[in-house]
């Protein structure tokens, strides 16, 4: 996948905000990998802040909606993984500031 396309996808994913934390999933460090096959099927590998997150279906739907606006994306599969586990260390500086974490 071209780097420019990957950047566009990550930019679209920055519009997906974790409803509990109010920060986007990219800056939270929840997106682990982005890939697209030759047919435009996009694979998003991501995690959530906790295994019991009741908002997982909402976040997955928001990811699909955000990517539907990109002409290269024909469909999206979201793969939720728990390994490696998410930690605050994965958050961007922006996310840490927004959440008051040092």
Curated annotation (Swiss-Prot):
Against InterPro entries, the record matches this protein to: Fe-S_Maturation_MIP18, FSCA_dom_sf, MIP18-like
Q: Which SUPFAM superfamilies match?
A: Fe-S cluster assembly (FSCA) domain-like
Family statement drawn from the similarity comment of this UniProt entry: Belongs to the MIP18 family.
Instruction: Please name the gene that encodes this protein.
Output: yitW
Functional summary from the UniProt entry: Involved in the maturation of iron-sulfur (Fe-S) proteins. May function as a Fe-S cluster carrier.
Originating organism:
Bacillus subtilis (strain 168)
According to the record, the segments passing through the membrane are: none
The name on file for this protein is: Fe-S protein maturation auxiliary factor YitW
* Gene3D superfamilies assigned to the protein according to its UniProt record, in alphabetical order: Fe-S cluster assembly (FSCA)
